[in-house]
Amino acid sequence: MHDIRAIRENPEAFDRDLERRGLSPLSAELIALDDARKGAVSAAQAAQERRNALSKEIGAAKKAKDEARAAELMAEVARLKEEAPGLDAAQAQAAKVLDERLAAIPNQPKADVPLGADEHGNVEYRRFDSSRARLAEGRQHFELGEATGLMDFEAAAKLSGSRFVVLKGPLARLERALGQFMLDLHTGEHGYTEVVPPVLVRDEAMFGTAQLPKFRDDQFAAGDGFWLIPTAEVPLTNLVRENILAEDELPLRFTALTPCFRAEAGAAGRDTRGMLRQHQFNKVELVSITAPEKSAEEHERMLACAEAVLQKLDLTYRVMTLCTGDMGFASQKTYDIEVWVPGQQTYREISSCSVCGEFQARRMNARYRAKEGRGVGFVHTLNGSGVAVGRALIAVMENYQNPDGSVTIPSVLQPYMGGLNRIEGPNT
């Protein structure tokens, strides 16, 4: 959500930022809507002030025993009373139109975000190479999983349709181990507080993190004003909704392992086989709430926490700075972590870490009281995957596969697997 006062103060800067996102100038339209809102407020206030003044005049007229004048004034008061609901409605409608327009505009990118139209404009930030030799070729995860009978898309399709999977036996345990390992790492070494949040949230929560109203078609509605969460970012970030925090409480760092649900409305024809793009998947989420001057530093820290997962799993990856045309709606700046997937001989996204500034905080009315009497301001919010569990499973299966179809379990996961060091293939 944007601050109309800031837009009024520097409309040219606002329009330049939107232009970097490929949008036409909007400041003039927004200022006109704000003028209409102010006009409606002024009209309602003027009417109320006139009523107050008339009340005094009526008293004076009655005191002077000027009944004709008193009757005339009372008739005007009655007329103003009749008009008041309409003026109030006009005021509310003008504010609603402005708020809805502001809510539909994406966040302003930071100055150091690369300019670009789509993913081809993303810029590599850094990379990490596994200590193991990169596989020049290999089977894809669904080929490995289906061969062992531990990954069943056919059974999932009977239950739920396409873009679902049933995992069994040691492969199901490996997926569970990955999530547990990530939580232990983020809580034990990175200082995040584990949260078990609801996976059903209300409209207001989805609005707060900017899934609604723009991305309604990408979500699963559960009825009665509830939505299945597309990411734990939604409940974790909304923990501070309508709160005023003390600056000493910041930063707040939350993590959660939850199922996530996405309609994938725009994904027709993409990644139709396997687990890369599912309607339901597990993900470990990281959320930070900070003071404004600390958010850039926290963004780098969050990225490093997500990277640590892949480094401990000894998986090759690269970090990409997303360009203006590829970054998310609520983001000021985003880093994507892309892990090497031998079955496709390419990098695929496994984490996305974003700083949103006060964009979400304004939608949630999440504020903090600064030290030394500096008043109350909006917090900054950050979110990142730490990481997507299903995609981590894909990466482990494909990078740790053996010629016989078995999968070696990374050493950091073996304690979570009861000492099991590999998942047997069909020929072992």
Swiss-Prot record:
GO MF terms, alphabetically ordered: ATP binding; serine-tRNA ligase activity
Subcellular location: Cytoplasm
Residues that bind ATP: R262, A263, E264, E349, I350, S351, S352
SUPFAM superfamilies given in the database record: Class II aaRS and biotin synthetases, tRNA-binding arm
Catalytic reaction list: tRNA(Ser) + L-serine + ATP = L-seryl-tRNA(Ser) + AMP + diphosphate + H(+); tRNA(Sec) + L-serine + ATP = L-seryl-tRNA(Sec) + AMP + diphosphate + H(+)
EC class: ligase
Keyword entries, A-Z: Aminoacyl-tRNA synthetase, ATP-binding, Cytoplasm, Ligase, Nucleotide-binding, Protein biosynthesis
Listed EC numbers: 6.1.1.11
InterPro entries: aa-tRNA-synt_IIb, aa-tRNA-synth_II, aa-tRNA-synth_II/BPL/LPL, Ser-tRNA-ligase_type_1, Ser-tRNA-synth_1_N, SerRS_1_N_sf, SerRS_core, tRNA-bd_arm
One matching Pfam family: tRNA-synt_2b
UniProt record, GO biological process: selenocysteine biosynthetic process; seryl-tRNA aminoacylation
Main location: cytoplasm
Gene3D superfamilies: Bira Bifunctional Protein, Domain 2, Serine-tRNA synthetase, tRNA binding domain
NCBIfam families in UniProt: serS
Family statement drawn from the similarity comment of this UniProt entry: Belongs to the class-II aminoacyl-tRNA synthetase family. Type-1 seryl-tRNA synthetase subfamily.
Domain comment as written in the entry: Consists of two distinct domains, a catalytic core and a N-terminal extension that is involved in tRNA binding.
Function summary: Catalyzes the attachment of serine to tRNA(Ser). Is also able to aminoacylate tRNA(Sec) with serine, to form the misacylated tRNA L-seryl-tRNA(Sec), which will be further converted into selenocysteinyl-tRNA(Sec).
Subunit structure: Homodimer. The tRNA molecule binds across the dimer.
Protein name (Swiss-Prot/TrEMBL): Serine--tRNA ligase
Lineage per the UniProt record: Bacteria, Pseudomonadati, Pseudomonadota, Alphaproteobacteria, Hyphomicrobiales
